[in-house]
Amino acid sequence: MKKRKIVVASSGASGVNLGLKIIDLLPDEIEKHFIMTQNSQIVLEKESNLSIHSNEDISASIASGSFGADAMIIAPCSMNTLAKIACGIADNLVTRCASVMIKEHKKLILAPREM
């Protein structure tokens, strides 16, 4: 059986730990990928010793439909990111991956952080 792939993204700096907690809660048999926006990256780098990949790397393998992700979770999802996804704007890795999920009819879960 093919290993399932899940993409988790964080687009809100104040809730980057929520995205990481989701990664921790996913079963070990799932292949996990994590994306974060620049603000999320700044907060995480200050709070941990992790090196994070750039949200501007729109050519990353997970930005392609051929990558075959089964689902994507954006938690937290800023209103800016939600609006870009709703309007079809794919100008960074998070929004590009979300666009691919919609195009491929895959699960896309958005967890807004403000209303």
What residues fall within each predicted segment?
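A cross-family phosphate/adenosyl-ligand binding-site feature
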Residues: K2-I109, R113-M115
